[in-house]
């Protein structure tokens, strides 16, 4: 992949690249939709990556060619959001550059060719990997030295404000940090991040992500409904995020909250409270190598996402139940061993399974038969986040 990318850069720009950068996709391990409520998450950088061959330029502009897309060009003297760029690669480029400018760092111009083996629309966060890749490039070219969490915040801002998709900080933080990471997004302070040294295969399990075959196109309203409804719950108590609402008070006032915010909103709030506890338990389990407890929390997370959070079936297409089908097939094949859950934002994309090593080949073969060839992707943990891979000259 690297050599082909260098050759492509030379073809497009008429000169050789000077630098090679990489940023990983991510796997969410526990903490489904807790990030945008200032909750806790467990996630991991994975061995799938987005890579850029880069050459800095003196002009205040970025030209970027991403595999399978037309050339993007951004004038770094025009960094305000542009309505016509919503949901485009150009919007993310402009947004990340603007994020550096907002921190008092003049963004650097460069030419880049980008390719990726992070599956788009898969729940492995190809967009976050791209944002962290851009942030890593700018961080190096400008010498800004911003820490990983600041790059994550810039990526989140670019996705929310410029791309136009509501996003918590989980995806970007996991891609930027590297390894298995626990992050507490408690309001009023900087996020607390803790890296956990764990190799799932040493404990007898493979981490597998399964593509359900349904993509995320047209589902922005479904995603947006989750923070929107939770905001109704928070608003009842005069708060901005659920982390600020005392759980005991929430249950004391449950009939009134239900009347004000609606049934689904309170069910989703119940999920958030429970899910934060699951993250806490899963983190403690991983730190002491207790896979039984960890997998219990993984399965609990999956059940809660289905029953309470309700991010499995798209609202406008109830006949599209690819995630439910994939989860049912995985649970049947696991026969009570390991664990499985929805992976990422939900409604489409992928599910995640922890599969005993002695069953993983048969599991993947049967899931591929049931969902389509190459649906299963066996992943490994990548220990680093966004990084300069190579200086080429």
Residue spans for each PLM region:
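Structural signature of FAD isoalloxazine-binding scaffolds in flavoprotein oxidoreductases
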Residues: 39-58, 177
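C-terminal nucleotide
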Residues: 1-26, 51-87, 182-341, 353-393
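N-terminal pre-core extensions flanking Radical SAM catalytic domains
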Residues: 348-351
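Gly/Ser-rich oxyanion-binding loop with an adjacent helix/lid
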Residues: 1-40, 74-80, 85-202, 334, ...
């Amino acid at each position: 992949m690297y050599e082909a990318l260098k050759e492509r850069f030379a073809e497009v720009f008429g000169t050789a690249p000077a630098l090679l950068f990489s940023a990983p996709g991510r796997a969410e391990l526990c903490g489904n939709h807790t990030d945008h409520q200032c909750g806790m998450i467990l996630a991991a950088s994975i061995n799938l990556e987005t890579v850029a061959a880069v050459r800095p330029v003196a002009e205040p502009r970025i030209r970027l060619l991403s595999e399978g897309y037309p050339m993007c060009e951004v004038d770094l003297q025009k960094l305000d959001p542009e309505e016509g760029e919503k949901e485009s690669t150009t919007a993310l480029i402009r947004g990340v550059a603007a994020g550096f400018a907002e921190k008092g760092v003049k963004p650097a111009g460069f030419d880049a060719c980008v390719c990726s083996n992070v599956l788009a629309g898969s729940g492995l966060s190809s967009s976050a990997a791209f944002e962290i890749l851009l942030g890593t490039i700018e961080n190096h070219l400008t010498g800004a030295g911003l820490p990983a969490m600041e790059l994550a915040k810039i990526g989140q801002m670019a996705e929310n404000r410029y791309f136009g998709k509501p996003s918590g900080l989980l995806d970007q933080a996991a891609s930027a940090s590297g390894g298995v990471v626990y992050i507490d997004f408690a309001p009023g302070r900087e996020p607390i991040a803790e890296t956990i040294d764990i190799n799932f295969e040493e404990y007898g399990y493979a981490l597998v992500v399964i593509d359900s075959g349904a993509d995320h196109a047209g589902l922005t309203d479904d995603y947006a409904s989750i923070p929107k409804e939770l905001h109704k719950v928070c608003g009842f108590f005069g708060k901005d995020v659920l982390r600020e609402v005392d759980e005991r008070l929430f249950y004391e006032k449950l009939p009134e909250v239900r009347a004000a915010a609606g049934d689904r909103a309170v069910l989703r709030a119940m999920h958030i409270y429970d899910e934060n506890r699951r993250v806490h338990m899963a983190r403690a389990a991983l730190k002491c190598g207790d896979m039984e407890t960890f997998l219990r929390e993984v399965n609990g997370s999956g059940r809660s996402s289905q029953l309470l959070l309700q991010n499995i079936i798209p609202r406008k297409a109830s006949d599209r139940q690819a995630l439910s089908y994939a989860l049912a097939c995985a649970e049947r094949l696991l026969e009570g061993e390991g664990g499985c859950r929805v992976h990422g934002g939900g409604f489409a994309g992928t599910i995640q399974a922890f599969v005993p090593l002695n069953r993983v080949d048969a599991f993947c073969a049967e899931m591929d038969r049931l969902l389509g060839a190459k649906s299963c992707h066996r992943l490994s943990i990548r220990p680093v986040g966004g990084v300069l891979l190579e200086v080429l000259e």
